[in-house]
Amino acid sequence: IPSSWTSFEQVDEDQWALVRNLRDDVNQMLEIARNDKLVGASLDAAAFVHVPDEATRTILDKLDGDRDLVSPPVKTNGVDDLRTSLMLSQVNLVNSEDAVSEACEAIYVSKGEKSGCTVGVRQAEGSKCGRCWFYDEKVGKLGLPHADLCQRCDDAIFSWEKATGNKFSKEEEKVEEPVP
């Protein structure tokens, strides 16, 4: 195994330790929201996060992806986004604890014990993509060939159709009833 696969710069280790801690704090709030039937799956949720210091904010800003699910991604590589790492449809880094409280009901807001961030959760905005299940505010609004998909998934389906010559269909093959 190449050493580049098994050893990382300290900044990477610190970054992912922070993300894991933030994920733990978000998951605590998600459990409360699930118990109250505010959300079901984690992709039904959006998180609002206030970061207490500049060093932490700098790390999280690097992972803050595009607001919409676009292809190709603009702000990050599209894989290591906070939303993907936290398994949420949306993550909003905000500038104050008050902004978290304004966006989320008080019962779903907490000062994270592990990350030190103030974290709140609420129902994600937009519609659920029929392929990736992330919520996106532009699903069904862009006039795409597959109206129930986000732009990123529509692009993936288009690429697949182009490469294979097949047409994507969500409808299952209809099995005809045998004639008696």
Task: Name the predicted role of every residue range.
Residues 156-170:
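Short metal-binding segments enriched for Cys and/or His
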